[in-house]
Amino acid sequence: MVAIAVVTVSADETEELAGRLAGRLDPGDVVTVSGELGAGKTTFVRGACRALGVTGRVTSPTFTVGHRYRGSVDVSHLDLYRFRGLSSAEWGDLEPYFEGAVVFVEWPEAGGAALPPSRAAVRLEHVSPEARHVTIEAPDGTLLSGLVAE
């Protein structure tokens, strides 16, 4: 695994970073997004959605489990917060979200081995009320090369 780490000082900067990552993704790619409640997971996904041409409102799917957005490519946004692990029946309900879309999964820990391999894993941590420490890991350096200024 290769990782980069950066501190963003505003929601706009977090969205901008997400947008740069999103521009490197293709349908079928899965990005996991982890962090405490309020760490900025949905903010990160919103920035990615904007970069992928989504113009509508991007909200947390905590109570609906998933949203599918249309943009220049389809984007699926899942939130597994309410799950303790995915049963095969629950996975069957989620599987359509993975077809032909770039997929962002919040609280991926609940998905366990049921989730397909991720192209990138994002972790957000509070630094201050506005600032976030963002770590992005990928299997190799190709996806991350040049993502942030050295």
Question: What residue spans do the PLM features occupy?
Answer:
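Conserved lysine of the Walker
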Residues: 41
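Phosphate-binding P-loop
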Residues: 22-27
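Conserved nucleotide-sensing/catalytic segment adjacent to the nucleotide-binding pocket
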Residues: 57, 62, 68-109
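Short phosphate-coordinating micro-motif centered on Lys-Gly-acidic
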Residues: 2-5, 87-89, 93-150
